[in-house]
Amino acid sequence: MTVPHSRPDGARLARAALTRLVEPGDELAVQAVAALGPERALALLTGQDRLQPAERDLLADHAGSGAALGRRWSAGLARWAPRAERLDPARDLVALHRLGGGLLIPEDDAWPAALDDLGAAAPLGLWFRGAGTVPVAARALAVVGSREATSYGRQVTSAVVSRAVRAGTCVVSGGAYGIDGAAHRAALDAAPGIRPGPADAGAPGPVPTIAVLAGGLDRFYPAGHEELLRAVMEAGLLLSEMPPGASPTRHRFLHRNRLIAALSGAVVVVEARWRSGAQNTAGHALSLGREVGVVPGPITSPSSAGCHRLLQEAPVRLVADPAQALDLLPPGQGAVGGPARSDAADPPAVASTEPPHAAAARPTDGLTVEELLVCEALPVRRAVDVDALTVSAGLSLPTVLAVLTRLARRGLAERVEDRWRRSDG
């Protein structure tokens, strides 16, 4: 993909900075950019200037008005402040350019319009590595599933993906172990020797697969998939809303899933455990009006328990043949679905009844978003001070202090003199 990199324009620099300043899912930041533009929004979010009355009125059209907006804005400023002094967007842009990548922004002609369906949950930009373009959603099929894939799951994935790629459809997944990796491999195998066309040619080149990652693209994650992700990059694209150096966390993985859903015309879940990120992706797809297909499996297999749960409880379609997966895609080459519903960033949940083979409870189950952000920012071996945690978690100092107290009560955080580290729980 080709986008400007020498002397980047103001919008690209601003959006590069914003991707480091705010965490995915920060709707107020996205609403400020939509109302005031990226450059002005950056100045306000970093505290370089104050929100003027006329700007408050513009923001109110996107984010609501009155005292509630004032409280949200004050909380946002406190949340963004710890990272505001550490922004260097030019450095980030140069770092990705040296790796053959860059930052795709909504102001670019190549920006995938399907992401606009996310509304206030839309990404502020997409960092990329690779030479392909993002196809319209009608020509992209997401294939997702469990990290603990069975031989049955890999076989089904290969059949679905091979048929899709041979039909000229791009396969989108998350680059993880299990079904994701099987999907990318099958796409590459089905399109040997393919090299993407130029980004400025108007129509998308023959991109067989796209991996949407949860961390910065300057390193490959998981490390065991470095060779695979390099192959995906050479034949297709690596995408992430996170800037160089950003670590993948559970919070970022969950928000990454909405991008997989939005970039695709439909989602196929091949295998999923009772609690699975693949179900989260399916929920995002349903909230965006995308079709979701689910592959059934043996009733004795925990790897298919989540699939059967979706088939029972969600408005999904059974996929019993590879051809049925392609039938999920909308006709035509235009954008898919309508504007995101107000719950687009919070996909529909399914009933919580646990089956006999339900996964064991995790120490982090039931944590709020803020608690999860702080918990994931805590190192395991070495203790860090609270100021460092405010930067890593992207939260205000008072919020981090309050959250640390709650985590300590749950046995998830341990104070070492005036520093903190992760506890085993």
Located regions from the model:
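Glycine-biased, small-residue-rich flexible motifs in mid-sequence functional cores and linkers
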Residues: M1-A11, E23, R98-G101, I105-G425
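Short, small/acidic-rich helices and loops at N termini and domain boundaries
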Residues: M1-D108, P398, R410-R419, S423-G425
